[in-house]
A protein has these predicted regions:
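Conserved PLP-enzyme active-site core in the AAT-like
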Residues: 1-128
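Active-site C-terminal subdomain of aminotransferase-like
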Residues: 50, 69, 85, 94-196
Length: 198
């Protein structure tokens, strides 16, 4: 977030850090207070899977607060958003569907090459308004989807092919099994590490 704000010329001092618990989960009451004091357009960045602890923010109360103050809710789900695909972990993402936008990195859990990050926006018209390009050399076919309206680059290589191939190969059940197996492996590793002295 801080890097993106600097690149946009808004400066790293722009964001207001919301109080969090010891696992890095945003405190909804603190968010409510910050939104009540905010002046002007506001973006709230919640997280599905804290990079240091794996913790998930509580999306329902965060979405309620954002809705009350007309704030845009973005969920950084770089690796954790995939938890929604598995029955055993889906509860962690309860309410995430209420966000306005999401980010996910398929390489972090689907084992595809890096540089496959995706931004998903709930309202297609808002997405197109933010991304569309114009130029006399950009001629769109009125009967076809114009992909230049969905990405910041006018042209790019087919980054989605490995993601499509992984999803097609694994299927819904395979993705769910991958998520649940990896979580079980992480719990086993944590359990074994607690038995090591020092």
């Amino acid at each position: 977030v801080y890097t993106a704000l600097r690149q946009l010329g808004l400066g790293a001092g722009t964001p207001i850090r919301i109080a969090a618990d010891d696992q890095g989960r945003m405190k909804p009451a603190a968010l409510q207070d910050a939104l009540a004091a905010a002046d002007g357009p506001t973006i709230v960045c919640a997280q599905a899977g804290n990079v240091a602890t794996g913790a998930f923010d509580e999306f329902e109360p965060i979405a309620n607060a954002c809705s009350s103050y007309d704030a845009w809710l973005h969920v950084d789900g770089a690796f954790g958003l995939w938890a929604a695909a598995a029955p055993a972990t889906r509860h962690l993402t309860r309410g995430v569907e209420r966000a306005d936008s999401w980010a996910v990195d398929p390489h972090k859990w689907l084992n595809v090459p890096s540089d496959r990050a995706m931004a998903i926006v709930a309202d297609p018209d808002t997405h197109i308004a933010a991304m569309s390009l114009a130029g006399p050399y950009l001629v769109a076919d009125p009967g076809q989807r114009d992909n230049t309206n969905y990405v910041p680059e006018s042209s790019r290589r087919a980054r989605a092919v490995p993601v499509y191939a992984a999803l097609r190969s694994l299927g819904r059940a395979g993705v769910a099994e991958l998520i649940e197996r990896n979580c079980a492996q992480a719990r086993l590793m944590a359990e074994r590490l607690t038995k090591i002295s020092g």
